[in-house]
Every structure is written in structure tokens, then in C-alpha cells.
Amino acid sequence: MSGKIRQYLAIGMILACLALVVWGMFGHSWRTHEGMNPDDDRLHGSHFGLHEAYYSVDGDLGDPLEYSNACATSDSAYEPMCDMESAGRTTTNILWVVIAIGSIAILLSLLNPEKTWVVTLLMGAAGILALAAVLVWYTMHDQTYIADEVSLGLNAYMTIVAGILGILGARMYKLSP
């Protein structure tokens, strides 16, 4: 594989990384739970996003419960929502940094097609930060508020794949002569 093709492939990987990060950031399925309450046939599941939670009632996705609104109330029952809101806000900020770093890496690689260590470093940093964002969100997200059967949702997996693509793109760019 020639060096030019490797560079374009690396740029494509970073573009895919950024697309998945944006899709993951604005999606509503970072955590999912099917079969909320076995005693109530109307509740079918829930989806937790970075900034809100959705509950499926009678097969329809209900109105979102925004963490910031629930956190603003003085009711102690909503206190775990403050942790979820903080985790979502922190993760969103990290993902915006990933988008900025990845965009700068793409711009530098197109303006200066020569192999530079700065572009490789920026591409790798975008991938590592995308993975770190998922890890930060998972550790900050309140674990006691939701049931044990909750699993990572599609948007969390997309962000993980985005991080892997960012790291692989940096490696591919480094290998180009």
C-alpha cells in the first residue's frame, strides 16, 4: 500500500471517528434496560442518554426526563439524577474536545501532506480521549439508581468504536512514508 493511500485512509478513519463521536454525543442510548417492571406490562424499557432518560410505555417512547430539571428540584429522590447530569455534561465536554482535536488533525494533514508527528499525535489523542470519555461517563454515572440488568447502549458502543478508529488512524498515518 502506498504512502498516499495510507494517509487518505488515516484521514478517512479520523472522519469516521468524528462522525461516530457526533452521533454518539447526540444519541439517546448510552445505557439501555429492557423489561423495566415485570408486574406492569406497560413499561417496556428505558434509554439513558447523556442529558436525559427516556422510558418506553406501551411500546411508545415517552417524553424525556432531563437530568438538569430533575436535579433542580429539592426532592432527594432525584439526587442520583445530579450525578447523571454531571457525568453527561463532563462527557459532552470531552467529546467536544475530541471533535476539535480531530478537526485540527484533519486540517493539518490536508494542508501539510508531509508526514508530521503533530498530526499523528493529534489523531491518537482524539481516539484516546473518545475512549476516555466513555470511561469517565461510566464511572461518574450513578450505578445505584438503575437496575442490574442495564447494559451499554448503541451510542456508548459507537463512541468506543470511534476511539478505536482514532487510534488506528493515528497508527496508519504514522506508517505512511
What does each model-identified segment do?
Residues G49, T116, G153-L154:
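Alpha-helix initiation/capping motif
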Residues G3-H28, G88-Y138, T159-K174:
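Signature of small four-pass
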Residues D148-V161:
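Individual transmembrane alpha-helices with interfacial aromatic-anchor signatures
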Residues F26-S86, H141-V150:
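Long, glycine/tryptophan/cysteine-rich extracytoplasmic
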